[in-house]
Design a protein with these regions (language model features):
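Short acidic/histidine-rich active-site segments
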Residues: 380-390, 394-396
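Conserved acidic
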Residues: 253-257, 261, 321, 360, ...
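Adenosyl-5′-phosphate
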Residues: 11-20, 30, 56-57, 130, ...
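Basic polycationic patches enriched in arginine
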Residues: 2-4
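A mobile, often basic/glycine-rich helix-loop segment
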Residues: 393-416
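Cysteine-centered catalytic environments shared across enzyme families
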Residues: 10-357, 369, 519-523, 528, ...
């Protein structure tokens, strides 16, 4: 069965930015097409250009499509290759697909479309699940083998593309967004107490496979899951970031590393210019996004557009970094768009921002990315963005203290954790508190894994393969996809990340962090942007909660729904309401915003 709602066709693009979903039944019943269409409908913002559902017996796939690469309808999804007996639903972009297509054509494969989706199908047929090792890009996909009934799910190395899973009612369901699974009405939506502890401790990061809901899990990054028709499942992790170094790596000079980083980053930016449409940059004014602009300009990107956002100041804290983004825009003569957001508009946008979150995300810049993406999507469909540079090249303030640490887990927790488990016990109601410190145990286990000996390397590995996946990367995916915009992240090119992991940490920690990247950037961009205090995406009104913002969060946390749920200790909430500015986490976040955001997210999604 194949169903396609009528949708406008805008030329021809491929699997790029989209939403996928599916159902695999294990009880002999056929896939529920109406349910698949419901799930697909929830994800319409992710793929506003077209949509479709394909079902065969117990297996059904759904897809929403934003056209980026192959602008014809031959690339419609779910894609069925009747000759090979394979069906695919794919979300993402494979940057090296032209080379793979050429190689597969040499093996005798014939192609009926021009984009990357069909290349994945042929690659899977040729090389099995090992095909993922050959993909350079961001991806989440499902492939159904007609003859065996087997289904294969896969997610890229850094989890740039999401994939949520739920098992219920004799079936496995999957989707690009958690709300799409909730929309089935079949999943257990009770709160996972371990996930709650992670959220409240590990700076709102809930590592895979957990989510805030007991009935929803997420496929870990760099994982292929093979599901047989009888429901048996097997996971294979196909990539690990390795921080071990050869003697030659240790001996290499800072200048050599600088040149290698610049060459690799240049290649990463070039790869992400693949699309048949113009590319823009989310320009914060920091070194990461600025060097992307510089490299795109050097590569001859025509009509380069840049976008920057700023907010009203609060409590004497500035809300924009336009002085630096203006400098870069002028230097490269970009088509520059500056968006200033007054606090009233920021508040008005919060409900829609929270609705766009697949999981509760506490970072203030979610609303910034949401509003920025809204503006950018009026002009273009693809942007490059600087996420990942701090985690890959060591830009955060908690790395230098680890360099001489004898107790790396303690030192990491002291800088990164929002609260210890003892304090958490006074913030949560007793039935929600766990005596075992799950977040700390998670960090201990991760630090103990082989492949990273130096404490800084252990922290970089944790941050780049866990924290980055479930905070900055997810934030950018959710907020850009809310407006049908595709964000590409060159700093998460896996070859660049592998190179960076080999660089001794002293080269990363120099110059106040990201030293080797800053030296590479000096070859490209004006030094004023490099030799400055590290900035961030400031939204002061959410850090210093007062006035109408305070009214909004107090209303959510004292509502009937919140009282029935009973997550938080009432005395703790009253202290927060009385003096929000007194409760700031080590990472300079508001405790009140953290608890309010969780409650608002639950209510927004009808939970």
């Amino acid at each position: 069965v194949r169903r396609r709602p009528e949708a406008p066709v805008i030329g021809e693009i491929d699997g790029s930015m989209c939403g996928i979903c599916g159902e695999l039944r294990f009880d002999g019943r056929s896939a529920d097409i109406a349910m698949l269409e419901r799930m697909t409908g929830v994800m319409t913002p992710r793929g506003p250009d077209s949509g479709g559902v394909v079902a065969r017996g117990p297996v059904g796939f759904g897809h929403r499509r934003l056209k980026i690469i192959d602008l014809t309808n031959k690339a419609e999804q779910p894609m069925v290759d009747a000759d090979l007996g394979l069906t695919i639903a794919f979300n993402g972009c494979i940057y090296n697909y032209p080379e793979l297509r050429e190689e597969l054509a040499g093996l005798g494969y014939r192609f009926f479309s021009h984009g990357d989706t069909e290349v994945i199908l042929k690659a899977y047929h040729a090389w099995g699940i090992d095909c993922v090792k050959r993909f350079n890009g961001m991806f989440a996909f499902a492939i159904h083998e007609r003859d065996s009934g087997r289904v294969v799910l896969a997610r890229d190395r850094f989890g740039i593309k999401p994939l949520y899973l739920a098992e219920a009612d004799g079936a496995l369901m999957f989707a690009s967004s958690l709300p799409a699974l909730v929309a089935t009405g079949k999943v257990d939506v009770t709160i996972d107490r371990v996930a709650l502890q992670h959220y409240m401790t590990f700076h709102a990061v809930v590592p895979a496979p957990r989510t805030m809901l007991n009935g929803v899990r997420k496929l870990p990054p760099a994982t292929v899951r093979v599901i047989e028709p009888d429901g048996t499942q097997k996971d294979t992790q196909f990539w690990r970031l390795d921080f071990t170094r050869t003697p030659a790596d240790v001996a290499r000079s800072a200048e050599e590393w600088r040149d290698m980083v610049l060459a690799s980053l240049r290649q990463a930016v070039r790869r992400r210019m693949v699309a048949d449409v113009p590319v823009g940059v989310l320009l914060s004014g920091g070194v990461d996004s600025s060097v992307i602009v510089g490299l795109l300009a050097e590569e001859g990107q025509k009509g380069l557009m840049t976008f920057s956002i700023g907010f009203e100041e609060a409590n004497g804290e500035k809300g924009d970094e336009f002085v630096y983004s203006d400098l870069i825009a002028r230097h490269y003569d970009t088509d520059h768009h500056k968006i200033f957001i007054p606090s009233t508009r920021m508040l008005e946008a919060l409900p829609a921002t929270i609705e766009a979150m697949s999981e509760p995300m506490v970072s203030y810049d979610n609303v910034g990315f949401f509003l920025l993406s809204q503006e950018v999507a009026k002009h273009i469909k693809v942007v490059q963005s600087g996420q990942g540079a701090d985690e890959i090249f060591g830009g955060y303030h908690w790395y230098p203290p680890l360099a001489s640490s004898n107790a790396p887990v303690d030192d990491y927790a002291r800088h990164f954790f929002d609260r210890d488990n003892g304090r958490l016990g006074t913030h949560l109601n007793p039935e929600w508190h766990l005596t075992r410190d799950e977040a700390r145990a998670f960090v201990e286990e991760h630090f103990a894994m082989p492949g990273a000996d130096d404490p800084v390397d252990k922290a970089l590995r944790l941050d780049s393969t866990v924290m980055l996946v479930d905070d900055p990367v997810k934030r950018v995916d959710n907020m850009t996809m809310a407006w049908g915009l595709e964000a590409r992240v060159p700093f998460l090119d896996y070859e660049l990340a592998e190179l960076a992991a080999r660089i001794p940490s002293e080269h990363k920690l120099s110059q106040g962090g990201k030293g080797v990247l800053k030296e590479a950037a000096r070859q490209v961009i004006p030094h004023e942007v490099i030799d400055r205090k590290k900035g961030y995406f400031p939204v002061p009104a959410l850090k210093y909660i007062e006035g109408s913002t305070l009214e909004m969060v107090e209303s959510a946390l004292t509502s009937q729904k919140a009282r029935e749920r009973g997550l938080f200790d009432q005395r703790y909430l009253e202290r927060l309401f009385a003096d929000p500015k007194s409760a700031i986490t080590p990472l300079r976040g508001s405790e009140l915003w953290q608890v309010a955001l969780l409650e608002m997210w639950l209510q927004t999604h009808g939970l």
